[in-house]
């Protein structure tokens, strides 16, 4: 038998009485006293097939069939006696006339169903080709394909050109570590896999393309987290002569279409905007989740004079005292529970987590004794606290207060059910500092990358007060995740040279690394700006998943290993000799 008349998921009541030919995998087999039932699965769904004893040849073969066998079946669609309302094909079944076993299967190491979620992820990654058979994962990749095509079509309608940029490129010292590729024809020299197409897309603007996009593969040798992978995909966009307001509007239109055509959700535009400083002050994060409140509250004035030394010392040294008001949670948290919260904030540098519970009579807790009636009134007013609320405090330098309370806010939001998981809140975070000073290195680092344009009105401060200079940079945030980041780019050589100098490059180093770019700026480079959206992360959020690996067909583990192919792996001495390489493995 060859051919296929129907996909399994399309065999519904409209096909009753029709002869069909189906192909697929056996999801489940049941032998019920003569009748044998199979659930046959393909990429569109599952349909029940019944083998009757009267058809001896097909019935005999069905007795030998097991889960995940690949079958070719001919039969007739009939009304099902016991319908299954949970699946689209549940009103019908196929009475088998003929069956061919196209391939048998060993017993799988885990069930090809949602029960596999209980299996260790390492085992599922080792047998990724089996894990990918699960309908929920296949649905995620259909979503990914659809979203990619929506964005590609949208950008094509806006007259953007899709241009591929090099994968073998030049190593640069900024950002994460590069993945290096040795050159055989240039012994001792290396290419780098691109961390982004940043330089090439800017050069395409110099080339006069004006509007570019690419669904680009990027590579960063950095420590992994649940939402990071060493190789990832971004929707990369660059445009000339478009001001930032127009770029915002274009991206909002694109995301509106993605949300509508994938999830059927309408979202409101324009997206809210929030300066970086406000995001850090209110939410303790530059990617705030605005689906719930529980904002950080500055209580410096309220606690001044209370006499609690920890607060006083933090304020005297230029730090902050901020609080979270966990509404109605006083009775939910025991001292032991609060100790666990303190251990959590310690991860982010907080040396302690002070707390009080608000009662009808005032305050209760370890630091309540420091608050007299007047101080209690000030604190209650500052935090809008009521009886039954739990107030938690961190006193430290601003960065530690933001990091620790911001992380605690997110943790409590999830654990207390404060987040509406059906909501998608987009947000532009703007006005980032251009650079950050790292005390450990005694130097400035670019907050985004070295090619980000400072605000024109701040250029005079680039050498004298660089820490106060703001960038024309913006991040698109969705539900507490950075979905993408972009900026207006430097396009004048003198500003780029000043930026490199600020970042600690000597003139020689800047020319060696980026001389080609600065020379290009001397040939009539237009003003340009762009953005890159993380496709893997976008799909993770659209699909309601929490692990980025679920959106990548063949992902790496947290240790950057591929358990399926056993990569990375040693290579032969002959290969190394051909590349003029000798390995020297560090002893751990």
Curated annotation (Swiss-Prot):
Q: Which family does it belong to?
A: Belongs to the class-II aminoacyl-tRNA synthetase family. Type 1 subfamily.
Q: Taxonomy-wise, where does this protein's organism fall, top ranks first?
A: Bacteria, Bacillati, Bacillota, Bacilli, Bacillales
Provide the residue span(s) of the region labelled Aspartate: 198-201
NCBIfam families according to UniProt: aspS_bact (TIGR00459), PRK00476.1 (NF001750)
Please list the reactions this protein catalyses. tRNA(Asp) + L-aspartate + ATP = L-aspartyl-tRNA(Asp) + AMP + diphosphate
Q: What does the UniProt record say this protein does?
A: Catalyzes the attachment of L-aspartate to tRNA(Asp) in a two-step reaction: L-aspartate is first activated by ATP to form Asp-AMP and then transferred to the acceptor end of tRNA(Asp).
UniProt keyword terms in alphabetical order: Aminoacyl-tRNA synthetase, ATP-binding, Cytoplasm, Ligase, Nucleotide-binding, Protein biosynthesis
Q: Which GO terms describe its cellular component?
A: cytoplasm
Quote the CDD domains the UniProt record gives: AspRS_core, EcAspRS_like_N
GO MF terms here are:
aspartate-tRNA ligase activity; ATP binding; catalytic activity, acting on a protein; nucleic acid binding; transferase activity
Cellular compartment(s)? Cytoplasm
Q: What is this protein called?
A: Aspartate--tRNA ligase
- Could you state one GO biological process linked to this protein? aspartyl-tRNA aminoacylation
Q: Which domain of life is it from?
A: Bacteria
